[in-house]
Amino acid sequence: MIIYKDLLSGDEMFSNIYKIRELEGGILLEVEGKRITRTEAIDDSAFGANPSAEELSEANEAAVSSGVDIILNHKLISTLYNKKQYSAYIKKYMKDLKTKLEETNPERVDAFVAGAVGAVKMILGKFKDFEFYTGESMNHDAMVGLLDYREDGITPIMLFFKDGLEIEKC
């Protein structure tokens, strides 16, 4: 399995269990998810009680969570931006990412800078369609994943900057 982690924060963003394709000339990765509902039962032994010694045993209710599998599986955290805030964030993020690329992958910098302009314009043009998610550490200087839905209104997709990710093989 391959885990895609945020280059700046180290947060796990998604894995290769999803359909992944490149957009905007390889600048963005589109990750296709699914809406899911999962039930997580609570193990009675975790409470240390002896159910046979109880007069009336109440069944523990299971915790039910539903949402997009990418978000639930990788513990992404919802965050809010208005267009002005996101514009300020993305400008700083692009600068930080360019600096990191200059250190780690200098031959990729020119292609990143050239492609990032178009990707950011596309994102700002569709700004009202997106929901925003940070990694588990909630580092707002790191990558913010963008949630949207396909034209069918059912299939969730998330966008991530490819150059802002590092790959970890498990």
From Swiss-Prot:
Residues 1-170 form the TCTP domain. GO terms for cellular component: cytoplasm. The keyword Transferase does not apply. PROSITE patterns: TCTP_2, TCTP_3. It holds the Pfam family TCTP. Disulfide bonds: none annotated. Keywords: Calcium, Cytoplasm. One of its GO terms (molecular function) is calcium ion binding. It is found in: Cytoplasm. InterPro entries: Mss4-like_sf, Mss4/transl-control_tumour, TCTP, Translation_control_tumour_CS, Translational_control_tumour_p. Involved in calcium binding and microtubule stabilization. Belongs to the TCTP family. This is Translationally-controlled tumor protein homolog. The gene is tpt1.
